[in-house]
Amino acid sequence: MSVHIYSPPPTDPNEAERERAVVDTGALQARDDAKLEAICKEACRKVRGTSSLLSVLYGDTQYVIAAYGFQAGAYSRKNSLSGHALAAGNEIFIIPDLSSDERFAENPWINGENARFRFYAASLVRPYGRLPIGVLSVLDEKMRTTFSEPERRIVISAAEDAAARIVQISQERNMSPVPSPPPRS
């Protein structure tokens, strides 16, 4: 067993309210949605990353509800890069070289225990334009010295598209079918 020293992500002071937003949107039930998967794939392809994730953070867990080049599923929030992006609260959160940032250098997703990601860019996912429920991120196994403004816009736009799709899924789930009129006798 190895011991890793890295900084777990801080928790937002409005965490309870943010978690209510996660529940209200039904985002955790949006897993396996082909359109969300396509958003991840397109963002990854456009910025030439190796992986892209749509993560929803709730409790002690990071739920990867859609991904490209990565396994969707539930992961510990204490190792979460997305938790740091969420806590930062910035429209775009970029770490050019994860291995040289003391917050992440010994994280198992960086040091090779789980993966060897070196670059990370993420944007907040805000259904209804409100509290962020998670992030859309693009990762690369190579560090980057630059991340252009058009690339930043791609990640931000993908997060906006993911938020809109989560809203659409939520609305579709909440719609009740119109009952048919009773048969005439």
Predicted regions: what they are:
Residues R118-P127:
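A short, aliphatic-rich beta-strand micro-motif
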Residues M1-S80, P150, S157, R165-S185:
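Intrinsically disordered, low-complexity terminal regulatory regions
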Residues S51, L57, T61-I65, A72-R118:
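Regulatory sensory and allosteric helical modules in signal-transduction proteins
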Residues G49, Y120, I133:
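Short coil/loop residues immediately preceding or within conserved phosphate-binding loops
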Residues R126-P132, E141:
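Flexible loop/coil segments at beta-strand boundaries within sensory signal-transduction domains
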Residues L136-T145:
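Short beta-strand-to-loop transition segments that serve as allosteric relay/switch motifs
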Residues G134-V135, R152:
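PAS (Per-ARNT-Sim) sensory domains
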